[in-house]
Amino acid sequence: MICICDYRTPADVLHTLKNEFEVIQLPLDAALPAPVWGHSDLMIFRLDEYLITRYKYYSIASREINLICKKAGLKLILSDSAVGLKYPNDCGFCAAVSGKNIICRRSSTDREILRLACETGYKVLNVPQGYTKCSCAILADGAIITADRGIASVTLKNGIDTLLISEGHIDLPGYSYGFIGGATIHFHIIKLAAINSSLPAIFFYFNLFI
């Protein structure tokens, strides 16, 4: 399995990740705000067998993105969308996938994501929060944790099991508080403890207090 992470990820966290994953660190995107310019969920988006990124970012990170596509067997889609230093112009790729749903702020979401959602039969759930993926810890198909009430209201109405927690307790320099989605990764452990199925697992980045 591969793990895609910030180029600034601390050495001790990388050491832990490398016990389970092949780690690929993405280079920074200076078109994004400095506190988040290494955050992969603002630079790339995966849906099924497709990976979407911007032309301009691909010119910076082609080696890493090509490696991701090769290792994961993904087809690359390049978007000509622009990105900006201020919200909501920085969150075009920050959509969350849960089951056959794409949770996002539709007006801020990259048009290639919306096009692909339509072509592949995904339902787009429109929420007020542009940093949707940052705001959601994806537990499994159809289950999330979030501190965002606007997201929780929409996901609950659409049959997604949602745990609403209090905001805060996660640090993100430059912002009032961090987001649970940005502090976690979601993956599957295959055939763990002789159980013949895929089990959801969560890796928490440093300590999480709810």
Each model region followed by its residue ranges:
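Histidine/cysteine-enriched polar flanking segments
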Residues: 1-210
